[in-house]
Every structure is written in C-alpha cells, then in structure tokens.
Amino acid sequence: MDQSITFDLDLIKRYDQSGPRYTSYPTAVEFTDAFGEAAYRAACARSNASGRPLSLYFHLPFCDTVCFYCACNKVATKDRSLAQPYLDRVYRELELQRALFDGERVVEQLHWGGGTPTFVSRDQMQALMDTTRRLFRLADDEVGEYSIEIDPREADAQTVALLRRLGFNRMSLGVQDFDPKVQKAVNRIQTEEETLRVLEAARAEGFRSISIDLIYGLPLQSVAGFERTLERVLDFAPDRLSVFNYAHLPQRFMPQRRINAEELPPPQVKLDILQTTIDRLTGAGYVYIGMDHFARPDDELALAQQQGTLYRNFQGYSTHANCDLLGIGVTSIGKVDNTYAQNRRSLEEYYADIDAGRIPVFRGIELTRDDELRRDVITRLICHFVLDFAAVEDAWGIEFRRYFADALPKLGQMQADGLIELDAQGIRVLPCGRLLIRNVCMVFDAYLATKQGPVGFSKVI
C-alpha cells in the first residue's frame, strides 16, 4: 500500500477540531457505572468459548517527580515504600482475574505502563513477572509482544538487563524534547546521554523494538529547537517514533496548571513543528503508520500495515489483533468479549475492592451490534487508510450505503476537499487526509452526533 503523507496547511486548518483518538470505540466518555463487576465476570465467561489469546496491561502509577504536561493517572512521591502495598493488591487482582479465564488461554501481549514502571525496585519487578508467569501462560519470546515504558532517568544498564531476562522484548523511551529550556518549563530534566545509555543497553540485550516518544506543543518550543531534537533522535535510530500533540487541558489535569500558558507555542508554530517533523522523519526513511506514529519500513508495525493485519487498542498500534485485554491495576481499562471495563481510579477505592475480594471494575460498557460494526469500520480506517465496502458488508450482513446513509454527505465533502477518494467500492484516504484520519473516523461515530461537539477531546492536530 502507498504509505506516503502530504502536509496541506489549508486543509489542516479547515479540519483542525477536537476529536477522539479511538483507542476504543465507543470511547471512555461513554462508559457507565451501570456496568460493574457482575457484567465484567459475565463477559469473561462468554469470552472463554472463543479461546482467544490474552493481553495483559499493568498500570504502575508511581512517579518520582511530576511532569507538568502529564495527563496520566499517577501518584507523585519520593516514598518508594508505597510500591509494595500496591503490588500486593496487583498480585491479588491477578489471582482474581486468573480465576475467570480458562487455563489454556495464552498471553501473547503484555505491557507495563504508568506512571513510571521502573519506579519499583528490581526485586519487585522480578516478583511481579514471577507472579504473572505462575498464574498465566505466556507465549514464547518469538511470538509474545512484551513491552514496557521507560523513563531513562529511572533506569540503567542493570535494569535493562533484568527486564530482558524477565521477558521484555520491546520498550518505549520517554524523551519529549531535548531542549533544556523546554525541559525546565515542564519539570523534566533529562540529558541526551541518559537516553542514549538506556537505548544502547537495550540494543546490547537484544530488545527487538525500541521506540522514542516526543511531544510537540510544549512551552518554549520552537521549530529550530525541535528540529535539533529530531536530528539527535535520528542519530539514535530508534525502530519507532511517537510524536504526540500536547493537549493543554488544565481544567482536567492539575499538573498542567503549573505550565505558563503564555509560553505555549502559537497554533502556526505548532503546525510548522509538525510539518518539520514529518519532513525530517519521512526523509530519513520512516513510514507514517498513523495517529502520530512512525516506524522503520522493516518494523513489525509497518509490515503489519502493509499486510492488512495492523490493529489499534489502548496500548496504541499492535500486531496482535485478536486478544482479550485485561486491565490490571488502578484506572486500567480492559476489553473482554464485547465489553470495555475500567478499574477504580483512586488507590483507596482500588485497595478496598481488592481487600474485599472484588474485581475492582467500577464502570464500562457492553457494546451493541451497531457499536461493534462501527468499531470495525473505524479500526480499518485508522490502521489501513482504506475501507472496502464489500468486506464490511460480508462481515456484518449490511448494505453499506444504506446503513451509513447519514455519513455519505460528509464523506462527499471530504472527497471534494481532497482528503479521501470515495467510490462504489469503498474509501481510500489520500496522502493529504492521513494526518486528518481522526476526522474521517468521526463521520462514523454515532455518539458524537448526540453531543454539542466533541467536548473533552484533544485537537486532531
């Protein structure tokens, strides 16, 4: 498939609105507390008939310091002793979850996110993985995708070696920006040398994929400064890159209130940074996967996209499409059978549920057939930039143009604007429309039509 991308400033300005990132459909905004532990247990029981492989997401929320841009659920503390009471509850939740699933189901994907997963000690990392392997069957290294988010300030060569022995074969390194002025403005001082040491250790230990995360739109960023960061990152030659748009939502995320809004780059500068990023990364041979993600052409993500097997979930793009996802730990979200379920958001509530022997689900949603159909359509578009009407009709027993009649006028306008090619066979997102894939997906989002605009979502660019 053609994986090229074109930066069209006029189109971007015309379509630059707020919208979901579609790590799920329906999005978490639609979750309800009417969905609780009983509904989750029922979904797990139904899922056993499929024999699908499992994916485990562990949320380790602790951070030594707060990055002011952060929108994650985290606990900022210098007190490392807080980790053990949390891990004790995670072990108990693993036992509760394990009892819900057939023993023959294999874990093909595992991810530690945060927070800062490496906040915990090496002994605690060992114990967590030992417990996981005791309770669940993990696929061999050649098959399994076992990843961890790394703060290079919180890891060294010994930590990296341990993680590889524990079975991790992928890591993402948080960088955001190497400019010291920007780092000071967001309270994340991190040298290039710290990042390079961890990256080189990961390569030496045989990690199969190393990703670097950047953010554009942070205070005091400039085109020239971010280009210097890009040049340095390209020298590191990671397998993947994520370049996220900073969403300044201080009314929702308290740490962001410590950012001086007057120091944020104006919209035009953000767009210039984005254009520079696209030009530099694609010029260096990286493929635009979609939704802020780039990969080397021989990386598994790029190959899966070429082969039509790429998938997207709460962990981002994935090559493991057919897994039931178990969310472990505070605020984690899982996807089991035709449901999404989210754990308690506060440590106190999470601990109380676990101590009482309850699965700590406090909200979620059971998808209707329409939800599942629309999720399939959105996933096909967001992963492959192509939608074959006949394939959707065969899979769901519908007549596409009749079922989605309300979407056709909006699609027609997008065709006129050069975002997509629309004909009787389907939709093909053109190079000018790839940066705006969220806009194309929003056409098929039944929930947005019931709202006064996509409230609470970040800008698409």
Predicted regions and their residues:
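Short, amphipathic alpha-helical interaction segments positioned at domain boundaries
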Residues: 434-461
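A short, conserved structural fragment
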Residues: 415-425
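Local cysteine-cluster metal-coordination motifs and their immediate loop/turn environment
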Residues: 58-74
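C-terminal scaffold of the Radical SAM
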Residues: 46, 53, 76-100, 106-401, ...
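Amphipathic alpha-helical substructures
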Residues: 404-405
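Flexible, acidic/Gly-rich N-terminal and inter-domain linker regions that tether
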Residues: 1-54
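Short, cationic-aromatic polyanion-contact patches
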Residues: 182, 306, 428-444
